[in-house]
Amino acid sequence: MATLETGDLTIPDEILDPWLGKIKYGSAVATLSNSIPMKFGKGHSITFDIGEAEHVGEGANKSGSTVTPKTVTTAPQKFQKTVRWTQEVKWADEDHQLDVVRQILDLIQPALSRALDFGVFHGINPATGTAVTAMGTSLSDTTNSVEVGDADKPYTNLDAADVLVLADGYNPKDVALDPSFASVFGGLRNATSEQKLYPDLTYQTSPAGRLENHNSSVSNTVGAVGVGSFVSNVKAFVGDFGTIRWGIQRSLGLEMIEYGDPDGGGDLKRNNQIAFRAEVVYGWGFADLDAVAKIVDAVPAV
């Protein structure tokens, strides 16, 4: 029989690998953009703008090319989630222990997935809702902003955001929506047939849906309502999410803790409990904040 010991748990690959793949199912950022391989620690990636090709006439000299580099800095950001379980799991047989591990991973995964969004979108600690200085810039710092008007149709706001992103030379192919804004689109129907105008819009985070020729993802991480210690007023982020450089810098581990008070919930021994903790270290950076526009409702209709 397998014995759970204090410290890192050895999780079979057939359990851990699919779980790692689920990270994107709770994150709008991961749904709309691909991760890139990262080493642990601060890193830099460089993108280049080399301009257009030159026509060379017969017998003419070739001109030099101007290369404009942009450096994207990524820094490690650690998130953890701790859950408590009854102490009896230690005495169970191997099959039951693995079943418990699966349940624990299922509980932890959504929180760690959403943590990526809260960091990228707002630069906050999701446990407290407060800004994390070390995270620096967030997507909500973009100066491309569209204000929702009282009588606006939602697609006019989306169009206006597209215009801002296009003007900065990027393709506005992605949109992450707060559920309250997504439901406005979802409620629109053809006046004659009563068919939905956007049947491909889904209210889930992943896999991506489609909205007005954008890849779409819906999550309350967009507005951070109920999580942020502030009112963001953000209803959507629109733009090229491929300009977000993100990745997992450290493999996830599951640690079993038998002693002490690891989460402020009281002494484990006294409560006949053990705790399980998983950690993930993300890294992210932005090639250009102008690649994204935000739609905000700073003065909601009364």
Locate each region found by the language model.
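Alpha-helical scaffold segments that mediate packing/assembly in large oligomeric complexes
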Residues: R84-L166, K294-I295, P300-V302
